């Protein structure tokens, strides 16, 4: 189904289902003998959403060999491995910001992210989660039913990031006069190019000097029409459909040229340092990523930025 500027979703459909897919990957990774991440809430949240395919993956009932094409460059197991290092990257970003004295954290498009419940935040930290109202309500109710307690002053901010969300954030208690740590994890591909620019402008306007931003860039902006990338994704998701999970990830992304995020932010007063997925995998002694089209493999897709 084609995207529209005002489409909405729950956690079992459309863009919302990608949040559940990511949570299932975290749950699966947390079950490893020597896990790189600890997310005790991922599995019960995925169970509560009720998508059978994702529940089976999260709980270990479904084996990668049953789903992934052994000759394909990318699949469910590969995605889960890359999600592990992505999660570690953003976890460490928040921990580093807290150690530096930043006491406001903002999770943009939080989905089933449970960092407000599982990270060891300093006692005076406020964590803001911004996402669609139905997503936030579902997560809050599910975690309350589990008896989970936030590890910070957790504020839910129901808003659509494609539109006017800064006012909602301020109403939630955000103080633009104090530094903040922001993350945009797995978000930009699901925003139209102009909405990506507006979001970065809003973050800049709301950020006091010393604020930090970590983001995952959408590398498909200039290469999105690459038949090789599209075929890689569609080959992987073909196995999902055979197991009853119909999610066209490729169709959920917005096409069109985009600003390169680090250059855009550098022009707005941020200092940026980039990292590739390959570097993150190597840092944890994990297998290298599959071969990507020329021009993609060496482009950083993770950026940590400091204002001022």
From Swiss-Prot:
GO terms for biological process: methylation. It holds the Pfam family LCM. The keyword Cytoplasm does not apply. Its EC number is 2.1.1.-. Keywords: Methyltransferase, S-adenosyl-L-methionine, Transferase. It is an enzyme of class 2 (transferase). S-adenosyl-L-methionine binds at residues 131, 160-161. InterPro entries: Ppm1/Ppm2/Tcmp, SAM-dependent_MTases_sf, SAM_mthyl_Trfase_ML2640-like. GO terms for molecular function: methyltransferase activity. Exhibits S-adenosyl-L-methionine-dependent methyltransferase activity. Belongs to the UPF0677 family. This is Putative S-adenosyl-L-methionine-dependent methyltransferase MRA_3827.
């Amino acid at each position: 189904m084609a995207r529209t500027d005002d489409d909405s979703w729950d956690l079992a459909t459309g863009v919302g289902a990608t949040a559940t897919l990511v949570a299932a990957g975290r749950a699966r990774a947390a079950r490893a003998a020597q896990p790189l991440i600890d997310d005790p809430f991922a599995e019960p949240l995925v169970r509560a959403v009720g998508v059978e395919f994702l529940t089976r993956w999260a709980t270990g009932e479904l084996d990668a060999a049953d789903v992934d094409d052994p000759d394909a460059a990318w699949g469910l197991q590969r995605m889960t491995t890359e999600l592990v290092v992505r999660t570690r990257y953003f976890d460490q970003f928040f921990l580093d910001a807290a150690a530096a004295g930043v006491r406001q954290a903002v999770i943009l498009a939080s989905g089933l992210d449970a960092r407000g419940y599982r990270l060891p935040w300093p006692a005076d930290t406020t964590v803001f989660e911004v996402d669609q109202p139905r997503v936030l309500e579902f997560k809050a109710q599910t975690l309350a039913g589990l008896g989970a307690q936030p590890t910070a002053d957790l504020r839910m901010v129901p808003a659509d990031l494609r539109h006017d969300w800064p006012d909602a954030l301020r109403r939630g208690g955000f103080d633009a006069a104090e530094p903040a740590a922001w993350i945009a994890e797995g978000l930009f591909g699901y925003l139209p190019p102009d909405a990506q620019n507006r979001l970065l402008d809003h973050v800049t306007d709301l950020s006091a000097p010393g604020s930090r931003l970590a983001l995952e860039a959408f590398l498909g902006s200039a290469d999105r029409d690459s038949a090789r990338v599209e075929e890689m994704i569609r080959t992987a998701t073909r196995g999902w459909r055979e197991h009853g999970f119909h999610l066209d990830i490729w169709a959920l992304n917005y096409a069109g040229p985009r600003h390169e995020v680090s250059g855009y932010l550098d022009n707005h007063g941020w200092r940026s340092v980039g990292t590739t997925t390959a570097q993150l995998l190597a840092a944890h002694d994990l297998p290298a990523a599959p071969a990507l089209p020329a021009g993609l493999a060496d482009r950083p897709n993770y950026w940590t930025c400091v204002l001022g």
